[in-house]
Amino acid sequence: MRTLFFSSPLYGHIIPQIPLARAFRDRGDTVAFVTAREFAPLFAAERITLLPAGPTGEGVMEEMVCRTGVDPVEAGQTGSPETVVEMFAGVRVDLGFLDALAHAREFEPDLIVAEALDFVGPMVADALGVPYATMPFGPALPSPFAELFAAEVARACERRGLRCNLPDWYLDPCPPSLQCPDWQAPKGRIGLRPEAFRRDGAAGARAALAGERTGRARVLATFGTLFADTCYINSLLTGLLAQDFEIRLTLGLTAAEADFSGHYDRVEYFGFTPLDQLLDDVDVVLTVGGAGTVLGALSRGLPLVVTPQGADQPINASRVAAAGAGITFPPGRADPGSVAEAVETVLTRPEYRQSAQRIAAEIRELPAADEVADRLAAALA
């Protein structure tokens, strides 16, 4: 069997698909990924073929600025859905579809799997007459957002003489307690257990990240790859260190330890490190609320403090709060003192950890990636 994955050129979109891609690979199937060339080292480490198509994430954003005069990161922070829709369903499709289609014709897939904001894969599936599965990151998009995407995709398909076919399967990583209350499962829904990202083959033999505990609570502070504002993070560190915490801080893709001058003997800094390792031996996770981090933390039963900045983060934050698994703030820069107080609260009030552990149990009930790969292969046999 030949399975072709598609993803927008962003780590937070690619990484949730990796466990399923590994599962197909480990079955002995032929697996490849269509996304930007910049991710070649990631796929080489995974022993998965990369078929490079389309620009980098930065390239898509630069084209958005040229076309619209709007910075899509700033638009995501201010909650402008039209700009986000244009970036994923307009600009990225325009810049990547033809190369992706050429690669797919040569690859001859039996199945296409596309993350929920990749619209190139479904269009390629229609062009080739191949079944496809879509894979969201977490809770479903609110109806107004989904309707805007559907309208833009319809226009993109019409310009290319394609149909807007619904997916054959909806691979759902969202545990019930986090899902939007009015959501109805689409046809072809299959649960898929989310996993905190780990290096291939490293599940049982990874190096410890830290020495012995000092007795202080340990906070994992992770702010993703798009919204890592070092000035804001510095202010949050100051607030956290006024409390008696140890802090494990991720630097994202662009920051360096030197950006956090004056911080501090109780802070450990980490470049790009698998979340599976970062979560070891921590007590609470402070995050902007990307779906991968939220689901990864909850899979370990860890409570959260969420300070969303943009993209899908406000959606995830609202669902964490509704489930009782953490404290969340409105989008934007939260007051550092209030954030530190929230961390202290989720550490000292057991109901937050209890809710997180309940969701962890729900996640364990979802089918593992190898089960889902077998089920899809059987359906296509």
Protein language model regions, located:
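Donor-nucleotide binding loops and adjacent catalytic segments primarily
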Residues: 193-284, 294, 314
